[in-house]
Every structure is written in structure tokens, then in C-alpha cells.
A protein has these predicted regions:
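Blade/loop signatures of beta-propeller domains
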Residues: 19-36, 192, 196-208, 370-379
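Structural motif
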Residues: 68-71, 108-117, 157-164, 202-208, ...
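Loop/turn-rich, solvent-exposed surfaces of beta-rich toroidal or solenoidal domains
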Residues: 289-302, 317-383
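Beta-strand-rich domains and repeat architectures in extracellular enzymes and scaffolds
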Residues: 23, 34-67, 230
């Protein structure tokens, strides 16, 4: 099947360049780090933690508001509107070109299609790439910007039956369910219950690619597994990571595959009951897949790394309070971040509501004596944790999705610590006295 393709660049609903607004700043009273509020505009949305938000040069970060697409200068953090286009859904920035990719869904009808666009970040000129069927979701762009990848299900199944929409404060599905005796589940349990219902439905799905130049659509793999979270390698244009979605203790979650459907590889194999792995992401050099690993769930916490070339593994251990919804890694791969979690989440952390900076520390050989089979074993380490932001007022139904700035000097995240959702940045270095 070939989708409709439009090669002509067009400028659609482009706003005149706006004056950049300076961010509001303060010093976090508990950590001493400088925090900036970049935007609290209605509908603000900072991209998911493993989506690229930066231009190739690292000078601008893209994000979404109810009015369209905005950019933040990564040196000054001044914010301006790029594209006035209500209804646009921001996808990601290009790895090679200064391009913001976004989608729009046609209004009305059961067969409403989704159109994929590319906007020049400097000129705001827009071109159409392709039209995909209703229910399709574009998740990722490959390293040389020749292919988009997405997934589609044969039918829709709302995760929360009879839901009126999303939680206004968090922008997330308002999961709710009851135990057999009628008692209401906490949010985290209700979410697992609804995810399990979707997994058991075994809805036929497909992963596909779209040629960015021609719009041609090609199938990669079909399955009744719940396929989700596609991520191209940031350096290898044909290597695609994806997941089997559902309760993590039931599924073999993390997989890689080539765009021609070959070399399907399972990244992690469970070794104990209730062991879980997920929230996977690439290292910037494309050599390592990192993921949250718990052995077992809710008891022992690791950030695990898998070398895609050698299958060598490195695991960093975390304390319960340091477990985080999502982790990330700096561009130079020397630092990691974690965005914490609340007491109802999987770690049940009594004091976990912090934005963290992690310094990796290897576990050394005792007396310099290396085991004979050490090279075939998991390389273990720990994290030295530093608290950057007090997230005590955060409602973690809104996931912070922290990411490092390209220069490694800031951590950018989304939070509702002041009552409503906003995009923030925290400086990693302590302010000069």
C-alpha cells in the first residue's frame, strides 16, 4: 500500500515570529540548585523522555502548546512560538536536519486519517510527508532521517472503559478499577489491571515504516502481541527497538529488529518470577540499550545496560528512594538522571519525590584480582545520587520525563509542582556564591 504523498513545501497557518519570553527562576530551598520555569502555557507538552527534542546543533529545544509548536533557546532558555497550529501533535526533532515532525488528525468520521508533516525550525515552512490510516501512531525517526516508523492495531480498545477523557491536571488516562470485593484500586494497580485487559485482547497489530521522501509504507512485523514504544537507533538507520506492552512481569518486553523484518532479538530474559524490565532507551552513541530492571518487582532496583554489538551487560544498583519512573543519560554518557516516584508506585518509596543526578561507580575487583570468567558476567556498579529538585508537591500521574540538555548542563522536565503542568529546567552545577 502506498500512502498519499505531497512533495510540495507549503506554509500553513504560520504565526509571525514572536518575541522570546525570559524564564522565571529560583533556587530550590532543599537542594540549592537553580530551577527555571520555561513555559506554563496551556497545553504545554515536553516530549517523552526518549524522543529527540533538540536540533542537530543543540541550540533549540522543541515543545508543544495548545497553540502549536514552540522552541526554547538552550543557552538562554528564552521561549518563542515557532508554528501557530492548534491541533498539531508534536512528534520529535530531526537528527540531521533542523526539522520538527508533527501529525494532525482529520476531523469527523470513523475513517479519519492522520497526516504527517515536517516543519523547518528556522523558517516555519511546512511540508506534508504522508497520510496514514486512523489508529496509526508514528513513534520514531531513523538516524539518517529517511524513515519514520509506527504501529497500528486492527481495532481500537480504550484502556479505561467509559472514560470521559484524561485527567485535567496530569493529562494522563484516569485509570480506575475495583477489586473483586468492590474496593477501589489505587491508581498504579488500576493501570496494571487495564493494561492486562488490553494484552489479553490479542488485537492484531503491525509495525511499519514510512519513507520520508516518497511516503511509501512498508510492513516490518505483524503480531497479536501489543506492540509499542518504537525507537530507532540514533546511529544505525535500520535498527529498530520496540516493546511488547502490558504488565511487565507477564511480557518479554524489550526487542530489536531490522527494518526488513530480520534479526528479531530479545534484549532481556527473565530469570525469576516477578522480575520486570522496561522504560527502555538508547544511549546517544547507539551502542547501549538502557532499561529499568527490578529483581524482583518492587524489591531490588537496577538501571541495566545491554550492548547491542556484544550482548555485554552492565547493571547499576539503586536504593528504593532513588528508583525513578524514567531514567536518562547525558550526551557524553558520563551522567544519568532519574525523575523519582511517589509512594504508591512500584518502589513504594517513602522519600522518592526528587529529581536526581546519578554518578555511575563501578564495583572494583577485590585486591585487583579478577575472576577468570569476569568478561562473560554482568558488570555491576552503583550510583552516587545527588538531589536536584524537590518534587514533594508533584502528582506523579504526570510523569516528569526528564532529559539532559545537549551540553549536559541542565535537566529539563515537566511537572505540576506549582499546581499546574509546566516545563522546567534545573541547572546541574550549583550556583556560584
Amino acid at each position: 500500500m502506498r500512502n498519499s504523498v505531497f512533495g510540495l513545501s507549503i506554509a500553513l497557518a504560520v504565526a509571525a515570529p514572536s518575541i522570546a519570553a525570559a524564564p522565571t527562576s529560583w533556587i530550590d530551598a532543599k537542594t540549592g540548585h537553580k530551577v527555571l520555569r520555561l513555559s506554563d502555557a496551556p497545553g504545554n507538552y515536553a516530549l517523552y523522555f526518549n524522543y529527540n527534542a533538540y536540533t542537530p546543533q543543540g541550540d533549540l529545544m522543541i515543545f508543544q502548546t495548545a497553540d502549536g509548536i514552540s522552541v526554547a533557546d538552550t543557552k538562554t532558555w528564552a521561549v518563542r512560538s515557532l508554528l501557530h497550529r492548534p491541533g498539531a501533535h508534536l512528534l520529535f526533532a530531526g537528527h540531521k536536519t533542523r526539522t520538527a515532525y508533527f501529525s494532525e488528525q482529520a476531523r469527523g468520521g470513523d475513517d479519519a486519517t492522520i497526516t504527517i508533516f515536517a516543519a523547518d525550525i528556522d523558517t516555519a515552512k511546512v511540508r506534508r510527508i504522508a497520510v496514514v490510516p486512523k489508529g496509526s501512531r508514528i513513534d520514531t525517526l531513523n538516524a539518517d532521517e529517511t524513515l519514520l516508523a509506527g504501529q497500528v492495531a486492527s481495532r481500537d480498545m480504550p484502556l479505561q472503559p467509559n472514560a470521559a477523557g484524561v485527567d485535567i491536571k496530569t493529562g494522563q488516562t484516569a485509570y480506575a478499577a475495583n477489586w473483586p470485593d468492590g474496593r477501589p484500586m489505587v491508581y498504579a494497580d488500576a493501570k496494571e489491571f487495564r493494561l492486562n485487559q488490553r494484552l489479553d485482547a490479542k488485537i492484531p497489530m503491525e509495525i511499519f515504516t514510512i519513507d520520508v521522501t516518497t511516503g511509501q509504507r512498508r510492513s516490518v512485523v505483524k503480531a497479536t502481541d501489543w506492540l509499542n514504544h518504537l525507537q530507532f537507533s540514533p546511529t544505525d538507520p535500520t535498527l529498530l527497538m520496540y516493546c511488547h506492552e502490558g504488565p511487565w512481569h507477564r511480557v518479554d518486553r524489550i526487542w530489536t529488529i531490522r527494518t526488513d523484518g530480520s534479526q528479531m532479538t530479545k534484549v532481556h530474559t527473565r530469570t525469576m518470577n516477578m522480575e520486570i524490565a522496561g522504560h527502555e532507551f538508547w544511549s546517544p552513541d547507539g551502542k547501549t540499550i538502557w532499561y529499568d530492571l527490578q529483581t524482583p518487582r518492587g524489591e531490588d532496583f537496577w538501571l541495566a545496560g545491554y550492548d547491542v554489538a556484544t550482548a555485554k551487560r552492565r547493571w547499576y544498583h539503586l536504593d528504593r528512594n532513588e528508583w525513578s519512573v524514567h531514567y536518562n543519560v547525558s550526551a557524553d554518557r558520563t551522567l544519568f538522571s532519574g525523575d523519582g516516584g511517589d509512594s504508591e508506585m512500584v518502589a513504594h518509596a517513602p522519600d522518592g519525590k526528587w529529581m536526581y543526578l546519578f554518578h555511575p561507580k563501578p564495583v572494583p575487583d577485590v585486591a585487583g584480582i579478577r575472576a577468570d570468567n569476569a568478561d562473560s558476567l554482568i558488570e555491576a556498579g552503583t550510583f552516587a545520587a545527588e538531589k536536584l529538585v524537590d518534587m514533594g508537591k508533584q502528582d506523579y500521574k504526570l510523569e516528569p520525563n526528564a532529559r539532559f540538555s545537549p551540553d549536559g548542563k541542565w535537566l529539563i522536565f515537566r511537572a505540576n509542582i506549582e499546581g499546574k503542568a509546566a516545563i522546567y529546567a534545573v541547572e546541574i552545577a550549583m550556583p556560584r556564591s
